Amino acid sequence: VSNGVAEYVGGGSISAFVDKMNERAASLGCTNTHFMNPSGLHDDNHYTTARDLATIACSAFQNKIFRKIIGTEYYIEPKTNITDEERWLNNHNKMLLSGEKHYDGCLGGKTGYTTTAGNTLVTFAERDNMRLVCVVLADTLRFQYSDTASLFDYGFGNFHKEVITENQPETTVQLLPADALSLNVTTPEFLSCVEKGNCV
Protein backbone atom coordinates (compact mmCIF):
# COMPACT_ATOMS: atom_id res chain seq x y z
CA VAL A 1 0.00 0.00 0.00
CA SER A 2 2.74 2.47 0.96
CA ASN A 3 4.54 1.97 -2.36
CA GLY A 4 1.28 2.49 -4.26
CA VAL A 5 0.63 5.76 -2.43
CA ALA A 6 4.25 6.79 -2.99
CA GLU A 7 4.02 6.19 -6.73
CA TYR A 8 0.76 8.14 -6.96
CA VAL A 9 1.93 11.15 -4.94
CA GLY A 10 5.45 10.99 -6.36
CA GLY A 11 4.27 11.15 -9.95
CA GLY A 12 5.11 7.51 -10.61
CA SER A 13 8.39 7.59 -8.71
CA ILE A 14 8.85 6.08 -5.26
CA SER A 15 12.23 7.78 -4.88
CA ALA A 16 10.65 11.17 -5.63
CA PHE A 17 8.15 10.54 -2.86
CA VAL A 18 10.93 9.58 -0.44
CA ASP A 19 12.65 12.85 -1.30
CA LYS A 20 9.43 14.64 -0.35
CA MET A 21 9.36 12.71 2.94
CA ASN A 22 12.86 13.89 3.79
CA GLU A 23 12.09 17.46 2.75
CA ARG A 24 8.96 17.50 4.91
CA ALA A 25 10.76 16.05 7.92
CA ALA A 26 13.46 18.71 7.63
CA SER A 27 10.86 21.47 7.31
CA LEU A 28 9.27 20.28 10.57
CA GLY A 29 12.60 20.63 12.36
CA CYS A 30 13.57 16.96 12.44
CA THR A 31 17.36 16.80 12.72
CA ASN A 32 17.97 13.07 13.14
CA THR A 33 15.67 11.53 10.56
CA HIS A 34 16.40 10.13 7.11
CA PHE A 35 14.02 8.05 5.02
CA MET A 36 15.01 5.55 2.35
CA ASN A 37 11.57 4.06 1.62
CA PRO A 38 7.90 4.82 2.32
CA SER A 39 7.21 1.59 4.23
CA GLY A 40 9.62 1.86 7.14
CA LEU A 41 11.27 -1.46 6.32
CA HIS A 42 14.89 -1.76 7.41
CA ASP A 43 17.66 0.08 5.62
CA ASP A 44 20.95 1.06 7.25
CA ASN A 45 20.41 4.65 6.14
CA HIS A 46 16.74 4.79 7.20
CA TYR A 47 16.48 6.13 10.74
CA THR A 48 14.69 8.47 13.13
CA THR A 49 14.41 9.28 16.83
CA ALA A 50 11.52 9.27 19.28
CA ARG A 51 11.57 13.08 19.33
CA ASP A 52 11.51 13.41 15.55
CA LEU A 53 8.82 10.75 15.25
CA ALA A 54 6.68 12.62 17.78
CA THR A 55 7.17 15.82 15.78
CA ILE A 56 6.10 14.11 12.56
CA ALA A 57 3.12 12.46 14.27
CA CYS A 58 1.93 15.75 15.77
CA SER A 59 2.05 17.36 12.34
CA ALA A 60 0.04 14.50 10.84
CA PHE A 61 -2.46 14.77 13.71
CA GLN A 62 -3.44 18.24 12.48
CA ASN A 63 -5.11 16.52 9.52
CA LYS A 64 -8.71 15.61 10.43
CA ILE A 65 -8.81 12.69 7.98
CA PHE A 66 -5.67 11.24 9.56
CA ARG A 67 -7.22 11.67 13.03
CA LYS A 68 -10.35 9.86 11.91
CA ILE A 69 -8.38 6.97 10.40
CA ILE A 70 -6.13 6.33 13.41
CA GLY A 71 -9.07 6.69 15.78
CA THR A 72 -11.32 4.20 13.96
CA GLU A 73 -11.54 0.81 15.66
CA TYR A 74 -12.62 -1.04 12.53
CA TYR A 75 -13.90 -0.35 9.05
CA ILE A 76 -16.23 -2.51 6.97
CA GLU A 77 -15.31 -2.37 3.31
CA PRO A 78 -18.50 -2.92 1.30
CA LYS A 79 -18.97 -5.33 -1.57
CA THR A 80 -17.60 -4.21 -4.92
CA ASN A 81 -17.82 -5.34 -8.53
CA ILE A 82 -14.70 -7.42 -7.80
CA THR A 83 -15.45 -8.85 -4.34
CA ASP A 84 -18.87 -10.24 -3.46
CA GLU A 85 -18.46 -10.03 0.31
CA GLU A 86 -17.73 -7.37 2.91
CA ARG A 87 -14.21 -7.10 4.29
CA TRP A 88 -13.33 -6.04 7.82
CA LEU A 89 -10.26 -3.90 8.45
CA ASN A 90 -9.26 -3.78 12.11
CA ASN A 91 -7.11 -1.21 13.90
CA HIS A 92 -3.99 -2.85 15.37
CA ASN A 93 -3.51 -0.37 18.23
CA LYS A 94 -4.83 -2.28 21.23
CA MET A 95 -4.90 0.83 23.42
CA LEU A 96 -7.80 2.07 21.29
CA LEU A 97 -9.75 -1.19 21.41
CA SER A 98 -11.68 -2.73 24.27
CA GLY A 99 -9.68 -5.26 26.25
CA GLU A 100 -6.92 -5.44 28.83
CA LYS A 101 -4.62 -3.06 26.93
CA HIS A 102 -7.29 -0.37 26.43
CA TYR A 103 -6.26 3.09 27.64
CA ASP A 104 -8.91 5.65 28.59
CA GLY A 105 -8.52 8.74 26.45
CA CYS A 106 -6.60 7.00 23.66
CA LEU A 107 -7.14 8.77 20.34
CA GLY A 108 -5.28 6.23 18.21
CA GLY A 109 -1.82 5.92 16.77
CA LYS A 110 0.43 3.72 14.68
CA THR A 111 2.01 0.37 15.43
CA GLY A 112 5.18 -0.86 13.77
CA TYR A 113 7.52 -3.82 13.76
CA THR A 114 10.62 -5.10 12.02
CA THR A 115 13.03 -7.74 13.27
CA THR A 116 15.80 -5.13 13.42
CA ALA A 117 13.85 -2.27 15.01
CA GLY A 118 11.65 -4.36 17.28
CA ASN A 119 8.20 -3.12 18.24
CA THR A 120 7.43 0.57 17.87
CA LEU A 121 4.32 2.43 18.92
CA VAL A 122 3.19 6.03 18.45
CA THR A 123 0.04 6.88 20.39
CA PHE A 124 -2.06 9.95 21.16
CA ALA A 125 -4.17 10.30 24.29
CA GLU A 126 -6.19 13.14 25.76
CA ARG A 127 -7.49 13.84 29.26
CA ASP A 128 -8.77 17.04 30.87
CA ASN A 129 -8.27 18.98 27.63
CA MET A 130 -4.58 18.07 27.45
CA ARG A 131 -3.30 15.92 24.60
CA LEU A 132 -0.06 13.95 24.80
CA VAL A 133 1.86 11.91 22.26
CA CYS A 134 3.97 8.94 23.31
CA VAL A 135 6.62 7.20 21.23
CA VAL A 136 8.27 3.93 22.22
CA LEU A 137 11.02 2.43 20.07
CA ALA A 138 12.92 -0.88 20.12
CA ASP A 139 10.34 -2.30 22.52
CA THR A 140 8.84 -5.78 22.76
CA LEU A 141 5.39 -7.05 21.87
CA ARG A 142 4.90 -7.90 25.54
CA PHE A 143 5.72 -4.45 26.95
CA GLN A 144 5.06 -1.85 24.24
CA TYR A 145 1.54 -1.11 25.51
CA SER A 146 2.32 -1.19 29.22
CA ASP A 147 5.37 1.04 28.65
CA THR A 148 3.20 3.50 26.73
CA ALA A 149 0.53 3.43 29.44
CA SER A 150 3.14 4.10 32.14
CA LEU A 151 4.50 7.10 30.23
CA PHE A 152 1.00 8.47 29.69
CA ASP A 153 0.16 7.97 33.37
CA TYR A 154 3.26 9.93 34.32
CA GLY A 155 2.47 12.72 31.88
CA PHE A 156 -1.15 13.10 32.90
CA GLY A 157 -0.30 12.71 36.57
CA ASN A 158 2.50 15.27 36.72
CA PHE A 159 1.68 17.92 34.12
CA HIS A 160 -1.26 20.07 33.17
CA LYS A 161 -2.06 22.70 30.60
CA GLU A 162 -1.67 26.30 31.76
CA VAL A 163 -2.48 29.52 29.91
CA ILE A 164 0.39 31.84 30.76
CA THR A 165 -0.66 34.93 28.83
CA GLU A 166 -3.64 36.13 26.87
CA ASN A 167 -3.73 39.46 25.06
CA GLN A 168 -0.99 40.83 27.26
CA PRO A 169 2.17 42.51 25.93
CA GLU A 170 4.45 40.79 28.41
CA THR A 171 4.28 38.50 31.41
CA THR A 172 6.83 36.78 33.63
CA VAL A 173 6.77 33.02 33.97
CA GLN A 174 8.59 31.34 36.83
CA LEU A 175 10.00 28.12 35.44
CA LEU A 176 11.55 26.90 38.68
CA PRO A 177 10.54 27.53 42.31
CA ALA A 178 12.19 30.02 44.67
CA ASP A 179 13.02 32.44 41.85
CA ALA A 180 15.62 30.01 40.54
CA LEU A 181 14.64 30.70 36.95
CA SER A 182 12.06 33.01 35.41
CA LEU A 183 11.40 34.14 31.87
CA ASN A 184 9.75 37.22 30.35
CA VAL A 185 7.53 36.20 27.43
CA THR A 186 5.54 38.15 24.88
CA THR A 187 2.92 36.62 22.60
CA PRO A 188 0.58 38.21 20.03
CA GLU A 189 -2.50 36.37 21.29
CA PHE A 190 -2.16 33.59 23.82
CA LEU A 191 0.28 30.87 24.72
CA SER A 192 -0.38 27.71 26.65
CA CYS A 193 2.26 25.53 28.17
CA VAL A 194 2.52 22.40 30.23
CA GLU A 195 3.72 22.92 33.74
CA LYS A 196 5.03 20.37 36.21
CA GLY A 197 3.62 20.23 39.72
CA ASN A 198 3.16 23.69 41.19
CA CYS A 199 6.04 25.32 39.29
CA VAL A 200 4.59 28.19 37.25
Language model features by range: what are they?
Residues C30-T31, D44-V200:
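Domain-terminus/edge residues, biased toward the C-terminal soluble/receptor-binding domains
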Residues V1-R51, A57-K64, K68:
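Active-site-adjacent loops and short helices of periplasmic peptidoglycan-processing enzymes
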